[in-house]
Amino acid sequence: MTLFPVLNNTPVGKQVDSIYESRLDQFLSEGQYRDFNLPSVYDHARIDNPSGDVNNDLSKGFVDLKVYRVPDLSRPSFNEVVGHKKFDETASKGDTFGPSWATFWFEVHIRLPKSWAKYEQVIFQWNCDNEGLVYSQDGVPLQAFSGSERTDFILPDSWKTTEDTFYIEMACNGMFGTGAGSQIAPPDPNRYFTLTKADLVAPNLPAMALAYDFLLMQQCVKQLPSNCWQKYKARQICNDIMNTFHPNDLSTINECRNLAKAFLGNDIDSEAVFEKNNDKANVFAIGHCHIDTAWLWPFAETRRKIVRSWATQMNIMDRYPEYQFVCSQALQYLWLKEDHPDVFEKLKEYVNQNKFIPIGGSWVEHDTNIPNGESLIRQFLLGQHFFEKEFGVRCRTFWLPDTFGYSSQIPQICRLCGMDRFLTQKLSWNNINSFPTSTFNWVALDGSQVICHMPPANTYTADTNVNDVLHSIDQHKNLVNDQAGLLVFGIGDGGGGPTPEMLEKLRRCKGIANTVGYLPNVKLGNTVDEFFDGILKRTNAGQTLPSWNGELYFEFHRGTYTTQAELKKLMRKVEIALHDAEYVSTLASIFSKDYSYPKESLQDLWRDTLLCQFHDVLPGSCIEMVYKDAIPIMSKVLKNTEALLWQAIEQLGFKKASSSDNKEQLCLLNTLPWNVRGVITETEENKLVYFESCDGKGILTAAHTSLKHPAAAYQKDDNFILVNDHLRVTIAPNGLILSLFDLHKEREILDLKSGKNHAGANQYVLFEDTPLSWQAWDTEVFSLEKYEVLDKGKVSIKESGPLRASVVVDIPISELSHMKATISLEGYNDCSEFTGVNFTCEVDWHESCKFLKVEFPVDIHSEFASYETQFGITKRPTHYNTSWDVAKFEVCHQKFADYSDFTYGVSVLNDCKYGFSTHGNLMRLSLLRSPKQPDAHADMGKHTIRYAVYPHSKPLDSSTVRAAHKFNSNFRLLTRASDTANLDIFDAFQLVGEPNVILSHIKMAEKGKSIILRVYESLGGKSRARLVIKSLTVASVTKCNGLEEDLEELCTLKSNDYYEVPIELRAFEIATFKVNL
């Protein structure tokens, strides 16, 4: 007998999809129907009037707040405040606290009603829309508050039956600073924060669990496609829950949760949900807390963000056994150790349990465009050594989710420093082209590779909603190669990290996948390294993955190559000074018995240098407060580095020259690893002296005031002429260069007939710079269409030779800004010397949203220009054939850019600039920007900029590489302190062979008394050379990795008074050698 009725007396209509879906919004809403829906029963009880209405007997005395106002903008510690300062003011909800960056300490005394002992959990709820940290009575950091994102502090069970006191440190800034009107606007110095919550709450935990159940099913309703049956099942269950729930009958909460099990399963209230179908997992979730070491807040605030974030994460780990968390940046761990050693020791326990996982291997999450190659290696040398020393961990994954482009040699440097995996996601921000793959092999200039994964959810701060899990697969760009995605979740940038709500949502996402399917199978409990291990296993050790060769160019934030020019210039100076100090200190430690290598002092200087290479600091995208810290830090580093250098110089028998010194004793220190044929410098009497050395020593001793090939300056008709035996420069009365003529090749170097610029070279152009967003970060392609040519200069002769000939061009920029450019040409003795046109610009800059550049139209045609990048050359197109080419309208470089054809080329050298473009016949160096957010005064003031044009009668070769090094070197004027000053010691380490092989750095080893020599091939060809070591007794020479660990012992050939070590490098290889004495 059938159960199907004969008669139909209960008609059922088809649900109207839009209405039934929209209805669901009511159930969790705090809006007009709150009293009829779930939010009405979130609390069993609440005491919400601390220190308030004395007539309110319920709240009286249960929560008492007293506050200590720190009188300035300092950030005193718990021990400096509690027990030493008076909490003599009462505080209440509705009170305001400020101004911006102020600190307040609260003493919170609570007394729970006896009737609350029955409740499973009691929380203290706090919200002042700023950041705070709870301390126990004995000063242990417990948990952070961060405005609406984190307001609940679960009271320990021991507090539920007693009175207790705890403390809250309040920082008067939001998670993202105190921007006036928008997040990235300059900070509002007078922002105040209102205390809106200081409540004791007994939460209804089943009701909260039902809220998560309903939320995740509602997300499925909204986000699953219309042809998916799970979408409609979720909607029906949600409607059934709304029909079942009654605010006056709490038993209906459990009934509703039972309804939800048909969609979510039975295991979502514990970690057991993740024990099913693990072999089918294709989304691997990992908690993360990205803390910018500085950005919209200063370094000092970051130190507090670290303890707030990490103490909170350890708290969450205790509640969710399946939870694992990664965090990078060795410096931040060091700061925690210095500021909160007790928390650091506790953190170590979680590291040992594989719950809190150090990752990244670097000192900070650094920029990779601006720092030089040695800096990139030092990031890992210091970072990996710290992680190994403190945790016994060597990181295998370079974790850099949020920086503004990725240098072409990063894979090689990673492999040299113990890492073969790389994670980022920033390229998802590209504003022109979509990067084609999510999982791939990234290949460096030399062929070294790392496996790279870009989380397909396109964020490192996922909220663990249904969409985040879906996008971890459906936005994966190459599922044909691998079908797994990493989901990196947690509040980030300003710290914070995952919340309990995120873990609850992940449990339910897993429950959905287990029960009804469709959602990707998410897994918690795998490390990032295990995730990469899985990829390698599934792809035949990566061999079936696509590859990407060379730089990962970021099609956004191109203005960061130029913004905050003073810090960038200091960074260049410091990197070179550290090179010099380590080199001379190494010599002094070997050859002077009374000298010890200043290892700790140099390491401290490197730490500060690497700090300021953080990916918002050095690129120029921080608030002004950060640069008021960073510029003095770098200035102090430069001063102290120079002091160490001079101490080492004095140990070697030399001293700084003075006007009273015997001129016969004057000499120059050359820290370059090759002979320098000529350097013109000024003595204390402002006299020019030409130094040269022909014997390969590191000291230039032959001084001249007359030359075989002098330079001259004169006026011819209305034009001005600079000339030596190699070049003739013709300058118009307005300062533009009309002709740059190679006298040896009888060739005009400039092209003023084609292209945009027909007026002349060294043409300064002021572009309107109004990007679509992110002022300090961005410059856009359309800015190239709106500009003003600065052609109203006035020229006068400054020097007429013979050592140097020069003119000065006085150029108005606007009513507010002005510049003075000196164009000079030097004489020389030997035809092999560098001969180029030098430019020194002194700019008084007071513009708004303008971009100053200088242009050189040259008679060269090639499809590609070459740019020096770290340890190599990166070629970029000079045309706009494709959108990928258009995107590179502004690119980053180091010391030079070169435009060459088969027979001739022009290099533009610089001493502190990083932005460049070469298109058509126009080479353009970026000089200064003037964004107004987030630093309203970025780059305002005086700047000195040096650059040079270096023509060469052949394609790009080692002469340009060496000229750029020479242009950036600081040749210090010395005098011999005694007759015992030994010149031979500067000849102790030489590299002999093909000139494209560069000895880039000499230092003492981190451990022991060995000497480290860093060598790289600079132009892109397999090459041979010989390390020559003189005046020393060598036990052995080994090739080692970037962490200075031996790889292989090399053949060492001994002659009468020196040792030779033959070496062979592949194209663009970076090699490190250890000389064991």
Swiss-Prot record:
Active-site residue list: 402
GO molecular function: alpha-mannosidase activity; carbohydrate binding; mannosyl-oligosaccharide 1,3-alpha-mannosidase activity; mannosyl-oligosaccharide 1,6-alpha-mannosidase activity; metal ion binding
Keyword list, A-Z: Cytoplasm, Glycosidase, Hydrolase, Metal-binding, Vacuole, Zinc
Protein's UniProt keywords contain Cell inner membrane: no
GO cellular component: cytosol; fungal-type vacuole lumen; fungal-type vacuole membrane
Annotated binding of Zn(2+), by residue: 290, 292, 402, 615
Locations listed in the record: Cytoplasm; Vacuole
Catalytic activity, as annotated: Hydrolysis of terminal, non-reducing alpha-D-mannose residues in alpha-D-mannosides
E.C. number(s) listed in UniProt: 3.2.1.24
Enzyme class, UniProt record, top EC level: hydrolase
Requisite cofactors: Zn(2+)
Alphabetized InterPro entries for the sequence: Ams1-like_N, Gal_mutarotase_sf_dom, GH38_C, Glyco_hydro/deAcase_b/a-brl, Glyco_hydro_38_C, Glyco_hydro_38_cen, Glyco_hydro_38_cen_sf, Glyco_hydro_38_N
Alphabetical list of Pfam families matching this protein: Alpha-mann_mid, Ams1-like_1st, Glyco_hydro38C2, Glyco_hydro_38C, Glyco_hydro_38N
GO biological process, one term: mannose metabolic process
Cofactor detail note: Binds 1 zinc ion per subunit.
Family to which this protein belongs: Belongs to the glycosyl hydrolase 38 family.
Function: Degrades free oligosaccharides in the vacuole.
The protein's name: Alpha-mannosidase
Annotated organism of origin: Schizosaccharomyces pombe (strain 972 / ATCC 24843) (Fission yeast)
